[in-house]
């Protein structure tokens, strides 16, 4: 059970469809809170705190399935790797997407993060954009 100090108003439900196991996305820190889960199948989730403060760079990982939901606060980078084919990855957010939104990114495969992705970097399906994210040492912490 999740208890929040203040109400979280969900304004948008997003779904990302990934047809192949090994699709690897992230790590993106956004200026909104979100709940993430899957409608079907399994993903390996990874999060890195990119907020300014003592927890900057802290990493958490967990396997997610339709029975699991994770709350990701604004400023914590979110990433995932599909472990099954035909995954619908869902995320509820408390702010609408905007082209003016400020994001912070960190590289999925930065050794400093110590993320043990189940599917290797060589076998993972990664966008050029995600592969080009900076290493943690070059990330400017996000003000939230």
Residue ranges, per PLM feature:
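Non-catalytic, conserved peripheral segments adjacent to functional cores
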Residues: 1-64, 84-86, 93-144
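Conserved metal-binding segment of the jelly-roll/cupin
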Residues: 63-85
């Amino acid at each position: 059970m999740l208890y929040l100090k203040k109400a979280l108003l969900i304004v948008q439900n997003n779904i990302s469809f990934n047809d192949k196991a090994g699709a690897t996305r992230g790590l993106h820190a956004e200026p909104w809170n979100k709940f993430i889960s899957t409608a079907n199948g399994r993903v390996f989730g990874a999060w890195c705190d990119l907020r300014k403060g003592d927890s900057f760079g802290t990493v958490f990982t967990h396997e997610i399935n339709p029975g699991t939901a994770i709350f990701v606060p604004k400023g914590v980078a979110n990433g995932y790797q599909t472990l099954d084919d035909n995954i619908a990855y869902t995320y509820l957010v408390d702010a609408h997407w905007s082209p003016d939104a400020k994001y912070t990114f960190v590289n999925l495969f930065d050794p400093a993060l110590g993320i043990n992705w189940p599917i290797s970097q060589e076998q993972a399906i990664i966008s050029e954009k995600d592969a080009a994210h900076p290493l943690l040492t070059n990330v400017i912490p996000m003000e939230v």
